[in-house]
Swiss-Prot record, chains A, B, C, D:
This is Aspartate-semialdehyde dehydrogenase. One of its GO terms (cellular component) is plasma membrane. Pathway: Amino-acid biosynthesis; L-methionine biosynthesis via de novo pathway; L-homoserine from L-aspartate: step 2/3; Amino-acid biosynthesis; L-threonine biosynthesis; L-threonine from L-aspartate: step 2/5. The active site is at C156 (acyl-thioester intermediate), H256 (proton acceptor). Belongs to the aspartate-semialdehyde dehydrogenase family. It comes from the Eukaryota. PANTHER family: ASPARTATE-SEMIALDEHYDE DEHYDROGENASE. One of its GO terms (biological process) is methionine biosynthetic process.
Length: 365, 365, 365, 365
């Protein structure tokens, strides 16, 4: 596979790791070579180490890879490493990899709030990757060896929340009030053990530890402008935008649904039709860059009264497309709408792969 | 059963009708004698006419009742008639019953918006029954025969929404901004055929026809004051309160969960602890009147981070208690909280029975 | 699309019809041109007529086809017509089509028991299509116009049941005792309205009308030999094989699981390993014929203790592969095993398409 | 509470322990005083130690009990101890309790196969308690202190399987062939963590570790006669009865459904009606003894074509009643039928409490 970048996956036996492996199988630009997991799995063939729970079969390309421990020494040949590590382990491991000069795209929450770490939803704020470009250029200019770096994938439900906001803000100006109530899929809680069956059969759980804080905080970083020197992002202040999230777990395997309400700062607010048109016409930069996984239609605006629904819409554009429906006026704010995003693809591993494709397109790896 | 009032049920084979029958079985004050359903069922024993779908067994008291057609002539002996009729049939039938002098407590939406028809959540606005008292007194004063009347049970999710608001408004003054996103049980859609299995397995439906409009409108009637002459309710105006609802169907059999946010008009807003204390201390008038089904604890304030949950909390006080949890500050409005109510008991048939108990306590039947 | 056969679908808006349309979209040998449905849908664009419930999006190739009534006059150009009609309508309509000289592959039960109508599971008994070949040859020899014919797709769970039996019987001789207990997906009950949500949430239904009789009868036709004159099938007698089925509906969208036990007539019975090897080595005739949809691995033998499972295995070979696991000795009969088949693909519409591919390969259309 | 026996529960925070606590709350004959759990919970109030997952609220009687470690020294005052311990811990702990002279009714599998330990389904083989009576009498006759003893509750699905067989065997003689395919509720797998949500949403699992062996073995002990000297049970031999089980997990919270087939040794076999009548007329000894929890109707024979169903029938007689439906002839054996039993009541904790009531009625505690 001449010309392909070598990829590694950390946390390869976990739910996000499994999804990375699926997405990297037969990828035109990346060749999956190194899989890292716990010492319990290290030394085994991947097929023997993993409890595969994806509905797609385990790709042959990963079956016989011998699992390594999560140490940078085993990942030296990698141009890019995708981390699906649990937060308990990600902090130390990813730091060690970065200090070893490795480029990491991480789904863990550990470094999301670091000023100089881009927190990216690839269909929303790819320009924040300038932080990495600026870091590489600086090192180069200083004759230093090429530094490693960490790029963080956003929280899964935040990805769905901000996706439609980007084009709306670009067109109609700032949003100063935003609420979301989520109905989140259980795959978001992973498999070890994940959401217990007894808790989600004939039930919902009105609580996901830390999720609301993540959504309320991360939205203010993702939608924020870069500092002039491109070394960091200038967080939006509470005065600029108030975000309120309420998160629930429901009996859905994949696909987070969010009931959002928003208010534009500028008066008068646009019409429902203007909002719909704006969303339909939005083409993300990743698509313009020709990235393999970038959805042609970033936001699918649905007209049926009862859509989007996870079962029927989560796989649009292979899970990279975000669906928005029931766009209507809100008696309290300006608009109410229902947003659906595939929580393990555009909400996690998929974003990671698309971020890597953007890095490749910008020669940052 | 000396001293018991005679009760009838309309729409006896439907989901709400079945719940009325369960609640009226062995009731200390009501004796179920007459069951009305479609012509298809009329003439049959109830046990042979109904496709019983309740998890409690069909009460023996109803088993052998011969089903009648829904005509007032068959219900003459009834002191009170509970209507679980579908809206398509309720309008004409309930009108005919009222004009025949019969007292009806109806779960149908048909007359909810009529000025002189009380729309009651028995743990919230029993005082609106003064409209009926005033009507009966007027007829008596004019020497006219005792008139029939219709009292409407609110929409199921509205009942859960307004239950905690009543004590808060009494204590801290008006609420001027209110949002709710619901996760509603499928029993709310009835059984003929109700929500199709294929639509709710590994899925949610972000739409319930007419529900948002009902919640936004009915809240403004239930929380409104009576007119001085007690002939009607003075609806709250949009200036007084803005209500925004987003309704979803989830894979739960019974129990509507609602993620609500609210803002008090008066500044400063109370503290979280003050809100909790207010809710805990609230005792509904129905309990003070000694009504059989009135919950001792109207609002159960739960402290666990992940409660209330339908599976674990819907049956508090046999479904008459409303649970509130996760009471916390809202970055946009004042407070966010999760409310759970049993949609076919305090949200429908249960409210009907409790309304009848209040009527009995006030000698209005 | 030169060289492609023209296809039509009857019952196009139903669940089986929708699946035919998905499978025929971009098919290398068939071009979908005519869609038939009820008079309510006739005259509308398909996209406006259907309530699309498949997890894959509605193919563009079907979107704008104007729906016809189910009359042969509108299907004259069709080389093959796939019928997903409900049994209530299939009888008369399919007869009219056959008498108009049209070739029909039908999923309806109406003609399955007719002596001269082949009942086909394409990976099991394609040789029964000789009945059609013989009928066409006879007409040709008699100088008559080319007759229409009906080929029936088997009952969905019977397809899964007989798939592993074919290779076992070929290798180890007759099976004289066969039991199956099914755990069947709700998509098998269609969408109008299909299994009610309230019946399948936190529940199973130990009954599927007519299913056990279908399984016990159809098995004896599918596994039977052709009569010498190839005009019909000589049903297996109860002395030759006793079949006992118990059918249940479970909360699974697609994929029927069956717990089967079987006994070979010949003694001694083979070993577990011999059974596994036999199943692994089996290659169906359709694959040998080069049919587009034929699975390379007809029977997937799984070694994990808890497999097959619908969620993880139903899509093997795009739903044409049948999975068998937990092959073990049975204290009462010879062997017990778990069989999983995709009930709307190899169990219904998929089989129909594969049958048509076999007809094409044998120049019977 | 004068006259009540003192009860203790081991494994009090687990799923079976929680069910024991619910059943013992307000029990007329037992007063719950001592709760044992892991060292992690010991010393805490029960309400603070447990993650309560029952749909009924935590009984006040257990709320403030300080949890003890599972050592007999803390249970000295107990007349009876109910063990919901996990098998990993039950072996050593229950042995220590027995050797300390304590009477234990255990839901763990550890001692079920010991010759001198009765394995009891209280509505089926209470006579096997003679082993305990005989042991107590012997000790008494030898002037030894009163010995402790262990009585085992059967495997949950075995309880449902054997319940209808007892009356049939009594009336029509031995059963020599018995098959069962189970559709088992997830509560049977406990809560730590129990069946993962991702494995049971839109899925079934055709495997429950060790379950089939338990059902096939335990049936032969429960249905067997006592040895003449009443010191043990003479297991039924494979020549006397062949039992074949296939076990599956389905998306049901409580209530195991079993599709069973059986053949009587004696010819001719009875008729379907004779089987129904026999089951209807059966009254278990526990009811004759006046035991509090004994179901008046041990076997509920249901006539609807699609019953029993877990959601509608599991709570018959508060979960102590077993429902049997679809009794019909089997083309291979004699009869097929569907059996439903509440897996945590008559299948576990409920049986334990009923066993204790029988012991009490027989003055064995």
């Amino acid at each position: 596979m001449a010309g392909k970048k070598i990829a590694g996956v950390l946390g390869a036996t976990g739910s996000v790791g499994q999804r990375f492996i699926l997405l990297l199988a037969n990828h035109p630009h990346f060749e999956l070579k190194v899989l890292g997991a716990s010492s319990r799995s290290a030394g085994k063939k991947y097929v023997d180490a993993v409890n595969w729970k994806q509905t797609d079969l385990l790709p042959e390309s990963a079956t016989d890879i011998i699992v390594s421990e999560c140490k940078s020494e085993f990942f030296k040949e990698c141009d890019i490493v995708f981390s699906g590590l649990d937060a308990d382990y990600a902090g130390a491991i990813e730091k060690e990899f970065m200090e070893a000069g490795i480029a990491i795209v991480s789904n863990a929450k550990n470094y999301r709030r670091e000023q100089d770490v881009p927190l990216i939803v690839p269909v929303v704020n790819p320009e924040h990757l300038d932080i990495v470009a600026q870091k590489l250029d600086t090192a180069k200019a200083q004759g230093k060896p090429r530094p490693g770096f960490i790029i963080c994938i956003s929280n899964c439900s935040t990805a769905g929340l901000v996706a439609p906001l980007k084009p709306l803000i670009e067109k109609f100006g700032p949003i100063d009030a935003l609420t979301t109530t989520t109905l989140q899929a259980i795959s978001g809680a992973g498999f070890s053990p994940g959401v217990p069956g007894i808790d989600i059969l004939d039930n919902i759980i009105p609580y996901i530890g830390g999720e609301e804080d993540k959504m309320e905080w991360e939205t203010k970083k993702i939608l924020a402008p870069l500092a002039e020197d491109k070394t960091h992002v200038k967080l939006l202040t509470p005065e600029e935008i108030k975000v309120s999230a309420q998160c629930n777990r429901v009996a859905v395997s994949d696909g987070h649904t969010e009931c959002i309400s928003l208010r534009f700062k500028n008066r008068p607010a646009p019409s429902v039709e203007q909002v719909k048109t704006c969303l339909k016409e939005y083409v993300c930069d990743a698509y313009k860059l020709g990235c393999h996984s970038a959805p042609k239609q970033t936001i699918h605006v649905l007209e049926q009264p009862d859509r989007p629904q996870p079962r029927l819409d989560r796989n649009r554009d292979s899970g990279y497309g975000v669906s928005v429906g029931r766009i209507r006026e809100d008696p309290l704010l300006d608009f109410k709408m229902v947003v659906l995003s595939h929580n393990t693809i555009i909400g996690a591993a998929g974003s990671g792969v698309l971020i890597a494709e953007i890095l490749l397109a910008r020669n940052l790896i």
